[in-house]
Amino acid sequence: KCLVDTFDRNFQFQVEHVSIAKQADVVMIAPASANVIGKLAHGIADDMLTTTIMACKCKKIISPAMNTNMYENPIVQDNLAILQHYGYEVIEPASGYLACGDTGAGKMPEPEMLLEYILREIAKEKDLTGQKVLVTAGPTQEAIDPVRYITNHSSGKMGYALAKAAMLRGAQVTLVSGPCAIEPPPFVKLVPIVTAKEMFDAVTSVSFEQDIIIKAAAVADYRPAKVFDDKVKKQEGQMSIELEKTDDILQYLGDNRVPGQFLCGFSMETQNMLGNSRAKLGKKHLDMVAANNLKVAGAGFQGDTNVLTLITQDEDVSLQLMSKEDAANIILDKILSIMKEREQ
């Protein structure tokens, strides 16, 4: 329903703009013209839109959209600063071809992006507010020469799902990611890396300030001892490449964990999943391991589903086949449950 008349008596509420304002969980003004921005900044409420927004006590998000010169006008910028002072969140406009024919800043972001702002506010209970969460995701690539590298089949989907789920639940999320072909989740700090060494450095540089660390990345265990400067040409006979171990990130985190920090690892196995994963739990001083078997249908790389077993010191919890998004939230539920038990 589109409301235009501020005092239309045909609706069930006599003062429609007030009743609508009371029902809102979040308000988004998109696109927001210079005129609307100016009115709101100076308390002018003379139509259905501005009176409704003035009556709202919920989160308010505004997406300016106008000609580049108008957007950059100091008066508009001052008005946006006033709105920010009063708690409005201002979305930076995109750049591109504008309705006036110019090209520049002032374009409204795509509706899908605007929806992400709304989902961040209302999609999930904010039970991770105040928590800093570090997630690792994706594969690493270890160069052989300028053309070839050693890697694995990880898509990063599980790690990205965990990062987004934690963000939607109110956490401050850092995502350290190897090369992935999927869009990173919004509102997280993305730290792109390529090699295992880069991931080790990125993770250990911020690990001490994290409340929760979930290491879902598939990091190479070995790398070439020597990286060739030029492409290795095909020759007669066999060729061998000497490999050396990479640093064990999870072992380092377990050995150097901060008091009260929760540490969750992942374990992809092809045999003896429970035994190998429980051994990892103990050896690396983890709180939980999310284990899966590559040979189980729906649990492998690249897919949108997973079949996990959550292994802790006290129990093994087997999950059914489900989307990686659902699995991410169950993992976070379990982490929060264990953390609350510790506090009692």
Task: Tell where the protein language model's regions lie, with residue ranges.
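A cross-family phosphate/adenosyl-ligand binding-site feature
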Residues: 1-60, 67-156, 160-344
